[in-house]
Amino acid sequence: FLVRGFQGEELSRAAVIATHDDTAKLILLARLSLYGHRAARLHDEVLELVAEWGPADPARRLRVLNATKTDMALADLETSLRERLPAVEESIQRQLRAQLPADVALLKDRLEALASERAERAKAQLGKRAEDEANAFVKVLREQRERILKTRTKHDSEFEQLAFGFADHELRQLRDNRSYWDRRLARIERDLELEPAAIRRTFEVATAPRIEPAGAIVLWPQQMSP
């Protein structure tokens, strides 16, 4: 899917930008999305895979960069855009774009591996968030239950002693309070049983990761030809 997507109009419109660096670089951009139940979008991120090659290398051997060098390449891209370097010669741009389908085919497995790695990392983060929120919910309900139980116990211990001194409407209010606490406790028990699983389900990835090509950028050293 990734290769098919990048071999369409995205590659014919790929940006070719001049750079101060002495190596050529290909930056592939893809969007990774994870969806939960009822098509709820849980995660979005842009993937960047960067490969470099020596402009004078006739074999055009692509070397995929590690995370640190990828960040440096992206910083180099920002610098080139900010400084508005002169445009790369049009004939060079055409040659570089013509080579992109083969480049993308070579990088397909690495891009898919990167997408799989990032998807698993995102799932782990979502799972941790689900546990944190479920545990926080349980903690709040248990604290509420404890306060209600203490209040109800105090009410019950005093009720019989004070009952004869209360008017009928006051006794009704006391009984209404007791009934409310009982209903609230029953609701808390029900929520403790059901809601943690519902919270976890909210953060559960329900479909295969969706990966969409987002663009391709070539950084080309100034004053060089392919």
Regions found by a protein language model. Give the residues of each.
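Charged, non-catalytic accessory extensions
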Residues: L2-P226
